Every structure is written in structure tokens, then in C-alpha cells.
């Protein structure tokens, strides 16, 4: 959002509590076990009052380990790739605004981590560890 400050793009960050109130369970369910709560970024660029509004939506999963169903080690290399759609939407809107293109675009980026934090669930680390008693 820092780069958008130098443009006419209006940015709105929808936080976890509002996402819950809106019934956005798909997003909040994926991200609720992470230390960083899910959110959604809405960007509005208005370059022409007469033009229709085009919508762009891009997935912004910033870290996808697979949650409780962990991915195999070999596929962990691409865990940041699930944010590529969101990055493309943000870049497109920035480019449109920076070049003052005569269009109207709204971009939506639902963002979360699909990663289990140490404090997920009961908040106890030993919930995820098995112990062998001698």
C-alpha cells in the first residue's frame, strides 16, 4: 500500500473482525491458525468518470505450508507463489494509476497465511508433539 500513496488509488484494508461479520468464512478459516490474521485489500482506481468499472481479484496467500495437511519438503519451495495473483492485481492497478489510464478498476486481494502458528488451537505447543514416556 505504500507505493499506492503516490497515486490516486483509494485503498481499504478489511480486517479479520469485519471479514467475520461479512461471512467471509473461506478466507477466515484458512488463515485463522496463523499468527497473522487474514485480511482483504480493496483498491479502487478511477481514471474516467464515464467508464464502467472492471474488477480484478487475485489470491494473496503469502505463505502456504498446507496447514494441518503439510506439503512434502520438495514442494515447500513455492510456498510464496500463492500470492502471485494478488501481486499481479496490485501491480496492474499501480501501473494503470501511474500512467493515468482512462479506466475504472477495483482490485480485491484476499490475504492470509495457510500456516499453523505455535499458538494455534489451545495455545499449547505440546498439543502438536508426541511424547514417549520411559
Spans of model-derived segments:
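A generic structural signal for tightly packed, nonpolar segments enriched in small/aliphatic residues
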Residues: 1-134
Amino acid at each position: 500500500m505504500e507505493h499506492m500513496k503516490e497515486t490516486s488509488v483509494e485503498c481499504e484494508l478489511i480486517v479479520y473482525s469485519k471479514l467475520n461479520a461479512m461471512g467471509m468464512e473461506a478466507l477466515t478459516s484458512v488463515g485463522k491458525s496463523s499468527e497473522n490474521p487474514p485480511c482483504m485489500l480493496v483498491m479502487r482506481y478511477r481514471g474516467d468518470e464515464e467508464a464502467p468499472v472492471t474488477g480484478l481479484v487475485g489470491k494473496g496467500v503469502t505463505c502456504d505450508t498446507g496447514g494441518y495437511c503439510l506439503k512434502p519438503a520438495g514442494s515447500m519451495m513455492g510456498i510464496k507463489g500463492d500470492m502471485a495473483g494478488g501481486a499481479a492485481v496490485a501491480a496492474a492497478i499501480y501501473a494503470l494509476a501511474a500512467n493515468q489510464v482512462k479506466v475504472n478498476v477495483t482490485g480485491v486481494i484476499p490475504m492470509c497465511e495457510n500456516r499453523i502458528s505455535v499458538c494455534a488451537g489451545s495455545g499449547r505447543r505440546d498439543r502438536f508433539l508426541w511424547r514417549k514416556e520411559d
